[in-house]
UniProtKB/Swiss-Prot annotation:
Gene Ontology MF term list: acetylglutamate kinase activity; ATP binding
EC number: 2.7.2.8
Protein name as it appears in the record: Acetylglutamate kinase
Pfam families according to UniProt: AA_kinase
Organism: Hahella chejuensis (strain KCTC 2396)
NCBIfam families xrefs: argB
Binding site for substrate: G67, G68, R89, N194
Gene name tied to this protein: argB
Keyword Kinase among record annotations: yes
Amino acid sequence: MLDRDNALQVAAVLSKALPYIQRFAGKTIVIKYGGNAMTDEELKNSFARDVVMMKLVGINPIVVHGGGPQIGDLLQRLNIKSSFINGLRVTDSETMDVVEMVLGGSVNKDIVALINRNGGKAIGLTGKDANFITARKLEVTRATPDMQKPEIIDIGHVGEVTGVRKDIITMLTDSDCIPVIAPIGVGQDGASYNINADLVAGKVAEVLQAEKLMLLTNIAGLMNKEGKVLTGLSTKQVDELIADGTIHGGMLPKIECALSAVKNGVHSAHIIDGRVPHATLLEIFTDEGVGTLITRKGCDDA
């Protein structure tokens, strides 16, 4: 039970959150769920409560999850060798079966169950359900020694999104459900494709013209060359940071995904620290936030 001082603190926090609740009621927020937030028990529970809270105050949260470490664990237990090219898991037919078992099965249903235990009404699905996410094989190339025509590398069932059925998501959100999406797409021939979860989240946000795209990470946010978190950026500033090499390496694909979403109609993208309990609520309902905000400033003038 709260004492009087703590009760006053809670009341003050709720009062400060009210303008944000009013502003975002009825809006759609797409959250890419991954990193430590998916493995730490306290963070898993705080994330589930955050998502339920959003729904209760009138926001439409949509969760897209990863599961790379869980896939790696099962492949190891099954003695299936796994390799990566350009950061992408080479996914032959045997590996794809494991990817579907992990992403569409255990990981997806664990998230659904956790949200439901906290009072939500979550429904899990993959892109194969009702052909919800269509995909094609991702073409990966690398330079050849003579620097002529690049070599095409076959990395198996790794795909890129070609389409997202908006009607499937709106059917669920209109029924007060919380969609929980595993990043598996289906090709024209019915083949399954393993797709990067950041890319799926970005495309879903674009199709829905979402208010926000939130990418949970294991870092404090996008940092400058001095290691300081950059809290607010325009798309033009992000382009400049990519050009001068400030954004590089493993963070580059994530930032490019967020940048593309904002340039294609999403109101804002957020790179947030998923290691912080209730990170999503802090980012939405407080002035301070817990990461980097990328806004559409300048997009509409281009």
